[in-house]
């Protein structure tokens, strides 16, 4: 999602836009959309704030296009490790052109909370130098 150039500000503008958008969605659907989004300061000539995100739900495209009022939208129809990596990289992106800008995560409460009850969480519990940090890929392979 991309903001029109006439909207000023940085993360506070994006935070308000997401909040107002979710309120419009809730008014229409009577329920909330589970989401995980992060802001990015654009490069090149525009330097606009972008929001990259993942939205949970089926058939949301027309609803998003109808209710998002803040600029351009690109909607993909899939989520893979590649798309998740693309979106989450903005949490740690070093922007040399805007060194004071830090992306802000905007997400539904409780995303990831079920992880704490999984065996993986116990395996990855902090144990000083003995901490195991294993990631399991979609194909079952483990990365340490």
Where are these regions (language model features)?
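Right-hand nucleic-acid polymerase module
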Residues: 1-47, 57-144
């Amino acid at each position: 999602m991309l903001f029109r150039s006439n909207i000023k500000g940085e993360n506070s503008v994006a935070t308000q836009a997401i909040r107002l958008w979710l309120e419009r969605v809730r008014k229409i659907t009577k329920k909330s959309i589970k989401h995980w989004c992060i802001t990015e300061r654009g490069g090149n000539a525009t330097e606009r704030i972008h929001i990259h995100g993942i939205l949970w739900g089926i058939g949301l495209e027309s609803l998003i296009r109808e209710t998002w009022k803040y600029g351009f939208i690109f909607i993909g129809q899939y989520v893979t490790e590649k798309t998740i990596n693309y979106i989450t990289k903005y949490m740690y992106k070093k922007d040399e052109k805007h060194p004071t800008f830090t992306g802000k995560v905007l997400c539904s409460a409780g995303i990831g909370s079920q992880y704490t009850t999984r065996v993986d969480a116990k395996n990855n519990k902090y144990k000083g130098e003995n901490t195991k940090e294993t990631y399991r890929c979609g194909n079952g392979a483990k990365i340490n």
